[in-house]
């Protein structure tokens, strides 16, 4: 499917793109190629292919959200280069 320069201008306008003539021609060729591939895909008979949302049959594996014991604060902060009370102290990232 070959697009006309006017069709490419319309797409560029809708996408709020400012294209010069060289870019317009390059886009025309690229978009035409993409549409050719889409036409090939549309020609494939998929009537016997089952509808799928995903192909791997994987599901999310989750765990029960339960409170459990964790690492004690002193053990967690044992190798911290700097701490303030029960917290890691780090250099400021944002200015105040």
From Swiss-Prot:
<comment type="similarity">
    <text>Belongs to the GatC family.</text>
</comment>
<keyword id="KW-0547">Nucleotide-binding</keyword>
<dbReference type="GO" id="GO:0050566">
    <property type="term" value="F:asparaginyl-tRNA synthase (glutamine-hydrolyzing) activity"/>
</dbReference>
<comment type="function">
    <text>Allows the formation of correctly charged Asn-tRNA(Asn) or Gln-tRNA(Gln) through the transamidation of misacylated Asp-tRNA(Asn) or Glu-tRNA(Gln) in organisms which lack either or both of asparaginyl-tRNA or glutaminyl-tRNA synthetases. The reaction takes place in the presence of glutamine and ATP through an activated phospho-Asp-tRNA(Asn) or phospho-Glu-tRNA(Gln).</text>
</comment>
<dbReference type="InterPro" id="IPR036113">
    <property type="entry name" value="Asp/Glu-ADT_sf_sub_c"/>
</dbReference>
<comment type="subunit">
    <text>Heterotrimer of A, B and C subunits.</text>
</comment>
<dbReference type="GO" id="GO:0006450">
    <property type="term" value="P:regulation of translational fidelity"/>
</dbReference>
<dbReference type="GO" id="GO:0070681">
    <property type="term" value="P:glutaminyl-tRNAGln biosynthesis via transamidation"/>
</dbReference>
<dbReference type="GO" id="GO:0006412">
    <property type="term" value="P:translation"/>
</dbReference>
<keyword id="KW-0067">ATP-binding</keyword>
<dbReference type="GO" id="GO:0005524">
    <property type="term" value="F:ATP binding"/>
</dbReference>
<dbReference type="Pfam" id="PF02686">
    <property type="entry name" value="GatC"/>
</dbReference>
<keyword id="KW-0436">Ligase</keyword>
<keyword id="KW-0648">Protein biosynthesis</keyword>
<dbReference type="GO" id="GO:0050567">
    <property type="term" value="F:glutaminyl-tRNA synthase (glutamine-hydrolyzing) activity"/>
</dbReference>
<dbReference type="InterPro" id="IPR003837">
    <property type="entry name" value="GatC"/>
</dbReference>
<protein>
    <recommendedName>
        <fullName>Aspartyl/glutamyl-tRNA(Asn/Gln) amidotransferase subunit C</fullName>
        <ecNumber>6.3.5.-</ecNumber>
    </recommendedName>
</protein>
